[in-house]
UniProtKB/Swiss-Prot annotation:
Taxonomic lineage of the native organism: Eukaryota, Metazoa, Ecdysozoa, Arthropoda, Hexapoda
Protein name: Lipoyl synthase, mitochondrial
Domain Radical SAM core residues, every copy: 116-334
Species name: Drosophila mojavensis
Annotated keywords: 4Fe-4S, Iron, Iron-sulfur, Metal-binding, Mitochondrion, S-adenosyl-L-methionine, Transferase
Compartments, as annotated in UniProt: Mitochondrion
Residues that coordinate or bind [4Fe-4S] cluster 1: 99, 104, 110, 345
Catalytic activity entry: [[Fe-S] cluster scaffold protein carrying a second [4Fe-4S](2+) cluster] + N(6)-octanoyl-L-lysyl-[protein] + 2 oxidized [2Fe-2S]-[ferredoxin] + 2 S-adenosyl-L-methionine + 4 H(+) = [[Fe-S] cluster scaffold protein] + N(6)-[(R)-dihydrolipoyl]-L-lysyl-[protein] + 4 Fe(3+) + 2 hydrogen sulfide + 2 5'-deoxyadenosine + 2 L-methionine + 2 reduced [2Fe-2S]-[ferredoxin]
Gene: Las
The keyword Iron-sulfur is assigned to this record: yes
Listed SMART domains: Elp3
Pathway in which this enzyme or protein is active: Protein modification; protein lipoylation via endogenous pathway; protein N(6)-(lipoyl)lysine from octanoyl-[acyl-carrier-protein]: step 2/2
Cofactor binding annotation: Binds 2 [4Fe-4S] clusters per subunit. One cluster is coordinated with 3 cysteines and an exchangeable S-adenosyl-L-methionine.
Further information: This protein may be expected to contain an N-terminal transit peptide but none has been predicted.
Principal location class: mitochondrion
Amino acid sequence: MLRKLNTPTTTLVRAASTRVEKLEEIRERLSKGPNFQDFIQNSDGVKEDWENYDGKLRREKGETQQLRLPPWLKTTIPMGKNYAKIKSQLRDLKLSTVCEEARCPNIGECWGGGEHSTQTATIMLMGDTCTRGCRFCSVKTARAPPPLDVNEPVNTAKAISSWGLDYIVLTSVDRDDLPDGGSKHIAETVREIKARNSNIFVECLVPDFRGDLECVKTIASCGLDVYAHNIETVEKLTPFVRDRRAHYRQTLQVLREAKNFNPNLITKSSIMLGLGETDAEVEQTMQDLREVGVECLTLGQYMQPTKRHLKVIEYVTPEKFKHWEQRGNELGFLYTASGPLVRSSYKAGEFFITSILANRRKSV
């Protein structure tokens, strides 16, 4: 009997067939196994209730090990048609958003419409490079960023008008290299937006302009609805958290004078928690903001963007955030948004502020 010999061609065919079978087996196992969403949830697919969480929430002095991210800070992956549409147009028009640059955890909710269908976005003007180096912020820094894009005000207004947004937040990098800090550029963007849609509500989250009150006046009188400037942290921690050119008292002065220049404005600020502040210091900061007329306040958890930035000292519980929300209401803030994932441009706050501004317009 003749034995059938294996030719090189026969061997290759068998090897290829085996690889195909293995690939099919892997695909089947993957289809039946956990998906990516499962990896950002607990093993049972349900996020733990914070009251039952027994992980370490605070780093003691001298400890170097990073804290484990608690379950209430884990968010879903951004997706959906509105999200994809906005992201695509931003790329086409070469616009930046703080939502992406600062790695905001609420990007999917805001760009997609969320619970109240108040679709929002936060555009970052004047490029993606800042002249300051705050130790909590992931935005790129340089002493001399690229020059301003003269077409940015028009491009921004075009994009926003095509999105059909209800509420837009304009923020910016600091531009200490410019004589006016970029205030005229921001103001021109607001005017372009309002010229295309007078009904849209515009919030400007702006720098301190080195305390230059003429720059503050330029912004306050440009037609915006909400003037926002973040105090970020308590007074004692300010030199260690913010760039040395940013001062606690200077921030308070900017917020006070913005309101003086335009009493019809809503003024707004934000505090990060988890940097080592005490309750008494948070309380004092909230009182200081109320004393200069700030009407809206957000409080959220600081989250370390990279290993080069400040480490989280404490993960504040949802219960404690609820306490600060109640305290803000007691102090007389028009609105207090306080929660682990709340950011200065928080969507639920924008929905509330939109209602307030709409009522004000009706009464005029």
